[in-house]
Amino acid sequence: MTIDNPSAFLKTLPTGSGVYQIQDAQGKVIYVGKARNLQKRVSSYFRRQLDSKTQAMMAQVQSIQTTITRNENEALLLEASFIKQFRPRYNVLLRDDKSYPYLYLATHQKFPRLDFYRGAKKAPGRYFGPYPNAGSVRENLALIQKLFKLRQCSESFFKNRTRPCLQYQIKRCTAPCVGYVNEQEYRRQVEDAILFFEGKNDQVIIKLTERMEVASENLVFEEAAHYRDQIRQLRRLQKQQIITGGKGNIDIIGIAESNGAIGFAILFIRSGRMIGHKPFFPNTPLGTTLQTALVEFIPQYYLSPLRNGDIPERIVTSEPLEDRLWIQRALSSGLNRRLAITDQKRAPYKQWQAMAALNAAQALSQHLAQKNTFALKLEAIQKSLALPNPIARIECFDISHTLGEATVASCVVFGEEGLIKKDYRRFNISGVTPGDDYGALRQALTRRYVRLKEGEGILPDVLLIDGGMGQLRQAAEVLEELQVSGVILTAIAKGPGRKAGLEKLFVWGRREEIHLPADNIAFHLIQQIRDEAHRFAITAHCNRRAKRRVESTLQEIEGIGPKRRQKLLKYFGGLQELQRASIEEIARVPGVSETLAKAIYDACHQHKG
C-alpha cells in the first residue's frame, strides 16, 4: 500500500502477526521484517526519533506491503523466505555458501570404506559431521586411518587388488582387499571408529585394553603391542581435544563488531567434541546492532537447505538474543525437531561463549585487513591503467577447448573482498564453428550481458578479456549492440615467447599497448584474475569433454539402448552421480546385471580427467 497519509495507513494495518515489506519508488523491496503485532511494529517506523540506519531507509519508502500469518512462528519462517527471495539492502544478508563436508562410512559394504563426502545424503551408510571445511575433514580422515586402519579406496580399486597398496605399508590400512584381515576383525575396526566418532573414547579404550590383555595372555605380543599403541594414541588425543563435558551436538555462535562491520564465528560441537569453527561475514547495513544482526542471522543460517538437515540440539549465543523463545519455537516448528537456544552466560557454556566471541573478533579483524588489501589493489589498477573512476568489481572471460571440441567460456568475478565465487559463471558454447574463439566469446558475452541488463546480477566496472585487440574488439561490439555503457573494456595478451611477466595490456579506445613492470601490484592482480578465469575454463571444459565421451561410450556398450541409458541416468539423478557410483551400486539398477554394471563402470572411468 502506498503511503500518502501515514496516520490513515497505519489504522488499516492488522494487529495480528505477520511480515511486512518496505518498498522504494521503483517497487524494489529494501527491507523485510516480522512482527507479533503488525500495526504496532510498522507504526514504530514513523516515530520522530529514529536511528541513522532507519532514517536512511525511511527516506526511500514509497509503500509497505503486509502479509498476515496464522501465528508468530509462521511470521519468522516467512520473513526468512522473503529475505532469501528479495535480498533487501537494509537486511543482514547471509551469503550463499557451499554445503558442508562429511566423513562417509559405507556400512552397507562387506568391508566398509571411509571417505570425504559433500552433497545430499542419498547413499546408505553413516555420515559424520558436518565439518566446517574440507581441511578439517581430511585431517580427521587421516587420524581415523592411523587409529583404526579403515580403507579409503574405491570399490573398483578394492576388487582388483592382487597385493596390498602403499596404505598397508605405511600402516594406514589392514589390507582387506587381499584377505590380510577377515570380515569379523574388520567389523571390529569399523565399530571402534563409530564409537570414536560418537565421542565414546573411553569405551574404545576399554575394548582395546581387553583385547591387549587377551593377546598378552596368549603370548601374541606383537598384537598386544599394536593395541597398546592404539590406546596411547587415544589417550594422547583425549588430552589434546577440547571436550565440552556434554554428549550432545551444540553450535556456539560468537559475534563481534568493528568499524561498522559485523562478523560471526560458529564453534561446532559434535558428540561432546569440538570439531572446528567457521567464520561468516554477512552483508550488514551500517548502524546494525549486534542484537539485530544475531536475530536476522540465525533463521537464515539454520533454515538454509545447505544445512542438509544437520541441526544441533542446542544453539548457544555469545550475546543476548532478542525474541529468543519466539525464534526457538519457530525454528523447532520449521525444522520439525526440538531445538533449544541459550544466551545466558553461565556454566557449562560461559567459556565457550567467550571463545566463540574471541574467534569472531579475530576472524573479523583478519577479514577487514584482507578487504583493505584488495581495495588497495583495485585502486592500484585504476591508477596504473589511468582509469577515470574507482573500481569495485571486475569480470574476466576466457575460452577453453581441445581442437574445437567441448568449447566452454568462463566468467570469474573479483571485488573488494577478493574472488566472488558465487558469481562465477560458465557457458557451454554451441552453434559456433569449432575453434572459433571470437564466435565463442561473442556468444558468452551476449548471454552474460543480456542477463545483467535484465537485472540478473551486477554490471562490472571493468571487463577483462584473456586475449588481444581482436578479442577486445568482439567485446566492444557485443556491449555496443546490447547498449551496455559504463563498463571499461580491457584485455591481457601473452608477451613474446608466452613468458609470464611480459604480457601486454590493452584498454579499449586507446591505441598504445600498456606494459607494467613485473613487480607492479596492479599487474599481479590482473595476472591472478586472468589465471583464475583460465583455471575455471579448463576445469569446465575437461568436465564437459569427459561427459560427452562417456555418453558416447555408453551408447557403444552392448545392451545399453536409449531407454536403459535414460533409466540409468534417472536412477542416479544424472551422469555425475552415475560416474561416482560403484559397480555394486550400478548393479542395483533394475535390469542391470553385474557384468553389465562392470562394463558401465569401466566406460564411466575410461575418460575421467
Curated annotation (Swiss-Prot):
Pfam families documented for this protein: GIY-YIG (PF01541), HHH_5 (PF14520), UVR (PF02151), UvrC_RNaseH (PF22920), UvrC_RNaseH_dom (PF08459)
Family that this chain belongs to: Belongs to the UvrC family.
HAMAP family named in the record: UvrC (MF_00203)
Protein location: Cytoplasm
DNA repair is among the record's keywords: yes
KW DNA damage (keyword) present: yes
GO molecular function terms listed in the Swiss-Prot or TrEMBL record: DNA binding; excinuclease ABC activity
InterPro entries xrefs: GIY-YIG_endonuc, GIY-YIG_endonuc_sf, GIY-YIG_UvrC_Cho, Hlx-hairpin-Hlx_DNA-bd_motif, RuvA_2-like, UVR_dom, UVR_dom_sf, UvrABC_protein_C
Name of the protein in question: UvrABC system protein C
Purpose of the protein: The UvrABC repair system catalyzes the recognition and processing of DNA lesions. UvrC both incises the 5' and 3' sides of the lesion. The N-terminal half is responsible for the 3' incision and the C-terminal half is responsible for the 5' incision.
Biological process annotations from GO: nucleotide-excision repair; SOS response
Record-annotated GIY-YIG domain positions: 15-92
Gene: uvrC
Subunit structure: Interacts with UvrB in an incision complex.
Gene Ontology annotations for the cellular component aspect, listed alphabetically: cytoplasm; excinuclease repair complex
Major localisation: cytoplasm
Native source organism of the sequence: Coxiella burnetii (strain Dugway 5J108-111)
Keywords, in A-Z order: Cytoplasm, DNA damage, DNA excision, DNA repair, Excision nuclease, SOS response
Domain of life (superkingdom): Bacteria
